[in-house]
Amino acid sequence: MGMHAGSYLAQRIETIKGYCINFLPTAYLHAIERAGMVSNNRKADKTEGTGLTFGKSLTVNAPLINGASFVIECEPITERIVTFDGVKHVFGRIKGYLCEESLLTDNGFEYGKLDVPLFEADSRGRVYRRMTTDTEQAGSFF
């Protein structure tokens, strides 16, 4: 996971001994944008004013966002935390997963039902991409 080296989380990541990667459904895009772009690195509580509420992970020492469709619970590998070019890179061990019951069937996890926006930022701009069930066979492009 990468984060701005000057951010609140970057300052705490080595001491909290746990973090959750929360995947929120597209219905939360307003809250996602507010936390990510408006509050960003300027506030310790970047979720203030978003309406998001939090629970406590039972697996790692970290909060999780109530309403997240999918959560990955991790512990940082402190000897593998590297800061380079203003970005703190944190390697972690996955300790658990949480997901909405509607995403599970007798056949396993239903990726096609997962409705989370994927944020992409590059020199062309910043966009949210939606997950779909469309696929392309690997190796079919050459």
Regions of interest found by a model, annotated:
Residues 1-142:
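Basic, polyanion-binding surface patches
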